[in-house]
Amino acid sequence: MPVEEALERLLALADAAPITATEKVALAAAEGRVLACDLVAGLDLPPWPNSAMDGYALRLADWQGEPLAVSQRIFAGHAPQPLQSGTCARIFTGAPLPEGADCVEMQENAQVMDDGRVHFLEPLALGQNVRPKGQETRVGELVIGAGTRLGPIQLGLAATLGFAELEVVRRPRVAVLSTGDELVEPGLPLGPGQIYNSNRRLLVSWLQRLGCEVVDAGILPDDLARTRQCLGGLGDVDLILSTGGVSVGEADYLGLALREAGELALWKLAIKPGKPLTFGHYQGVPVIGLPGNPASTLVTFGLLTRPYLLRRQGVAKVEPLRFSVPAGFDWPKAGTRREYLRARIEDGQVHIYKNQSSGVLRSAAWADGVVEVLEGTTPQQGDVVTFIPFSELLG
């Protein structure tokens, strides 16, 4: 299955099961959350005309080339008096323009005379260096649309408009579980044939960065009854996310439980790493099963699960930005699957890690993104390739 088809299917499933519950949170708690309703301006920005420069405010008609006396000083945060006819006002950046003034001359183009009057050295124009009322935003204008993920810029804009809290989509509740007798949690001694459970830490941290509420379901027991019990306790989550794969073998208790109390589809994705992917439901709860090799987990979560979770919160644009970068490597073997090579940019070119095995998480720690190599292509050094930064996938 092409990755585009898998994504299309997952997004359709997400659209059919949106998270509709919302809550109000303070701006300080809204980072990474999804706005639940349109944010509409309740005031003009700026609320009044103000100065864009440190300088002098005046009425253009009062200036005939002669120096003007300074009648007041206006600082940001202070209300000015109406401008006296035939005078100017010392004004500072962001301060309200006094009634009657219609332009500001920057202080660099003004000369203060011995008697305190100000001589303007350059021609003046109506409205120069003045920020008009409502220049940025007018009352009633849509400022941030529903379905927007809130970052520092959006939160700063909301604060500028006076919002102390925002209506956001409830956090997705995601249960993370691992499968595999070989897995041991870090800190415990390893037995023969065992490895530490790195995927759990990878996914829990990633989900938290995405604003999810994570339920750590641990490692599934090697027992069907206990697997049923574990899954049955996850009925209040929005997604069950497993790693380790689901097979058709008799010892695959997760697969058996899904088949008897839900539905299960095994997708063979035409990507590398990350060929096997599972989607199903257990007693109505969506289940996504990611491949167990760490690099495969990273790629399939970033390209498929992350968009699915964002779409369920109402985010429309869920795919990562892609950038065209010159290749600093040769990839001579054309594959039948789309490949995602762990890579990083150095000196204006993208270079790949020496070992692209799906079991090598160190390749991703070294990298700052992945190169997307299309099926049947053999990019050579200097060719333009597509690069997806981890910054587009992890946040």
Where do the protein language model's features map onto the residues?
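Flexible glycine/proline-rich
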Residues: E4-L7, T20-A28, G32, C37, ...
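Solvent-exposed alpha-helices and their adjacent loops that cap or buttress functional pockets
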Residues: P49-S51, L60-W63, P80-Q84, L97-E99, ...
